[in-house]
Amino acid sequence: MRPDYRKAMLESEIMKLITEALREAKDPKISGQIITISRVELSNDKRFADVYVSAMGDKDERVKTVEYLDKIKGYFRTYLANNLDLYTAPQIRFKEDPGIEASVRIQELLNKIKEEETQ
């Protein structure tokens, strides 16, 4: 099995498991929110996993959500260790995904241009 293929499969599996862990979490701070894991990037040595998260709400709420997820990352690492077939579970680093916000902004700009053209 090629290393790139294995890394991609592990990233996909980690994304699936973290999504499951979010769904099963009993924490009231995250259970009522809509949180989406957009992608996972695993380091070459498989020791670190950067998890890109998007959450509903304004900028402050999104930042607080990502900071809180980073604060309780031990829960997610334990969940990965129990469900993933690796020697050691990777350390998780949650990061806000700017891609979704950027695509929404681009769509708003395109809609604005379209409205100006019709007038």
From Swiss-Prot:
<dbReference type="Pfam" id="PF02033">
    <property type="entry name" value="RBFA"/>
</dbReference>
<keyword id="KW-0963">Cytoplasm</keyword>
<protein>
    <recommendedName>
        <fullName>Ribosome-binding factor A</fullName>
    </recommendedName>
</protein>
<dbReference type="InterPro" id="IPR020053">
    <property type="entry name" value="Ribosome-bd_factorA_CS"/>
</dbReference>
<comment type="function">
    <text>One of several proteins that assist in the late maturation steps of the functional core of the 30S ribosomal subunit. Associates with free 30S ribosomal subunits (but not with 30S subunits that are part of 70S ribosomes or polysomes). Required for efficient processing of 16S rRNA. May interact with the 5'-terminal helix region of 16S rRNA.</text>
</comment>
<comment type="subunit">
    <text>Monomer. Binds 30S ribosomal subunits, but not 50S ribosomal subunits or 70S ribosomes.</text>
</comment>
<comment type="similarity">
    <text>Belongs to the RbfA family.</text>
</comment>
<dbReference type="GO" id="GO:0005829">
    <property type="term" value="C:cytosol"/>
</dbReference>
<dbReference type="InterPro" id="IPR000238">
    <property type="entry name" value="RbfA"/>
</dbReference>
<keyword id="KW-0690">Ribosome biogenesis</keyword>
<dbReference type="InterPro" id="IPR023799">
    <property type="entry name" value="RbfA_dom_sf"/>
</dbReference>
<dbReference type="GO" id="GO:0030490">
    <property type="term" value="P:maturation of SSU-rRNA"/>
</dbReference>
<dbReference type="GO" id="GO:0043024">
    <property type="term" value="F:ribosomal small subunit binding"/>
</dbReference>
<dbReference type="InterPro" id="IPR015946">
    <property type="entry name" value="KH_dom-like_a/b"/>
</dbReference>
